[in-house]
Amino acid sequence: MEPKEATGKENMVTKKKNLAFLRSRLYMLERRKTDTVVESSVSGDHSGTLRRSQSDRTEYNQKLQEKMTPQGECSVAETLTPEEEHHMKRMMAKREKIIKELIQTEKDYLNDLELCVREVVQPLRNKKTDRLDVDSLFSNIESVHQISAKLLSLLEEATTDVEPAMQVIGEVFLQIKGPLEDIYKIYCYHHDEAHSILESYEKEEELKEHLSHCIQSLKKIYMQEGKPNLLDMGSLMIKPIQRVMKYPLLLCELRNSTPPSHPDYRALDDAFAAVKDINVNINELKRRKDLVLKYKKNDEDESLKDKLSKLNIHSISKKSKRVTNHLKILTRGESQVKDNTFNREEKLFRALEKTVRLCVKNISLCLQHIQDAMPLALQSVMDLQEISYNKDDEMDYSETLSNALNSCHDFASHLQRLILTPLSALLSLFPGPHKLIQKRYDKLLDCNSYLQRSTGEESDLAKKEYEALNAQLVEELQAFNQAARKILLNCLCSFITLLRDLMLVAQQAYSTLVPMPLLVSSISEIQNQVLEEIQNLNCVKENSATFIERKLSFEKKKPVQILPEMPHQTDIHRSKLLSTYSAEELYQAKRKCNATQEYDINLLEGDLVAVIEQKDPLGSTSRWLVDTGNVKGYVYSSFLKPYNPAKMQKVDAENRFCDDDFENISLFVSSRPASDSVTGTSESSIGDSSSSLSGTCGKFETNGTDVDSFQEVDEQIFYAVHAFQARSDHELSLQEYQRVHILRFCDLSGNKEWWLAEAQGQKGYVPANYLGKMTYA
């Protein structure tokens, strides 16, 4: 027996070596390129499948036998004992019966699917009842029918006109396992929902009557064909689930009935593992769905009794462990399992939620503002039309205005329908995934807790629940984020399009009202002309010199225009003035005066000038037209004093107190800080356009006490040279000679022409050249 056993083992090794060579060249792969194919004449709905002709099958069978018989059957015949040969024959006979059962049951199953589609699904769809959702009831039953027809076709092709010893069934299932799993996953995933929908339909008489009519017609066909009687619609809907669960049983039995030396044994082993994995994956998918439905249930749906029933020692212990593990993770005392894919999708999910919420809020506010502003804008247009109304113009703009108002209403309705409604519906879908994400984190904490303590059933259960919930979230969050992003982008594009259309309507209406659009330069010229006309009015002439336009804090400071430098006054110029003008017309500059406006001139302290006119073109008496003997221009009168050489010394002695005390009081102080402007020399006097106040000594009473107190005054104390009326809440009104305390020598933008002052408890901005520094000798 030992030589025979050794020979048998060698033959087994030889067969295993040849199996890899033969498997890829069996009934499907070894075909000639010139094989003739004909349509199957088998009756049934799968008649469109392609089959080999009889001559090609015979030739293919002969070639397969030539390859396997010399190396297989001869060797087996030499080594097998009569008992083993008898056992193998029994196994082959049983194998043949199982293959026939597999094919026959697949035919019956396919026939049931055909009847279901023809007698139930199609008639219900043709009724087009709104309350009857056929797709939700039967899911992808047509796809199940197609994959069953394909499987049956491949099984028949692998067995027809092929010797039982040469039939390979495992390769058929390996070839079709991918589509088989995808299709049955969808059907099994929706079966529970379909069953619930069926129960709800059976409660409505009209829908129940439609379903009963289809079932009765189907029962008649079953009775005519001699099949077992169909119980109800539920038993018909569960057939695909029963069938996919039966494939592993049939393949397992077929593998056990196949000799190990048979070329189909290894393929059957792989096919059995494949269909078993299909069932495991389907069950896992269903379990994941059940977990999602369990944790997705809103707390509002639970009664107080249900919530109290969950409160027990186990739940309290579990929650306390979660808190402990969470604190450990926060303090980095314990590592956490990370899923980068989930973290990325969760981050995108939260960003999308925030974006959608802000879009709903901001677009709603935008719509509200547009609706509020449109009537006001139309009223302004009508007022401007009335102002610019020309009697010769007989055009009627009422139609244009009504069209603009209608466009606003259309904009609001389209915005609500195309943007706000979809975004609001999308926003309402975020709480469900939020709750599942939180549950997923809880399950992760449970999993970490059990893994640290034990590896028992509780640990395995916690790990399975976490992995199931995590896999479900990763899969569905990707689909949800992709769909949410697409909806969001479409809504934003629609919003931009609606705004563009509204602006185009407004532009067309404007072009109708104003045929020729004005250029920016033309608008500036018109504005300047209007301002000049306003300044010529008597009511504004007096205040035109003190009119100062305050610059806002966010505006950039305009560059100061550099005026051309003028030559200094010489003795020749003085002689010319003395010989040309009378003594009453001659004045002398009390201090240096710099030009601040157009047509102003610069003066040095002691320069002699002749006053030509004691007002400027706008009628202001604060600026005089003077002649220096070299040039003519405007100078502020406060910088000048009468010229009288005979009384100069006497006037200086009499006015020593007044002039010395107020010589350094600047009417138009510089924008420089006080620290730079405390000297009394002409070169360092305060401001580029400073002046002293003459003839005001009598308005100030001085004694020893007052002088001492004034000397103790902070250097930040100034007084108002001119009265200033505030034009906004940010400015401070001042009376003439009113004392003010300077808080800051510039505004928020750094503009030193406006100072922040405080007077009588009020704060505000004041023009710098309206203030004078209070200094005393």
UniProtKB/Swiss-Prot annotation:
Keywords: Guanine-nucleotide releasing factor, Phosphoprotein, Repeat, SH3 domain. The modification Phosphothreonine is found at residue 34. The keyword Zinc does not apply. GO terms for cellular component: cytoplasm. Residues 37-52 have a biased composition (Polar residues). Residues 679-694 have a biased composition (Low complexity). Residues 53-66 have a biased composition (Basic and acidic residues). GO terms for molecular function: guanyl-nucleotide exchange factor activity. May act as a guanine-nucleotide releasing factor. Residues 582-645, 713-776 form the SH3 domain. It holds the Pfam family SH3_2. Residues 35-72, 673-694 are annotated as: Disordered. SMART domains: BAR, RhoGEF, SH3. This is Rho guanine nucleotide exchange factor 38. InterPro entries: AH/BAR_dom_sf, BAR_dom, DBL_dom_sf, DH_dom, Dynamin-Rho_GEF, SH3-like_dom_sf, SH3_domain. Residues 327-536 form the BAR domain. Residues 94-285 form the DH domain.
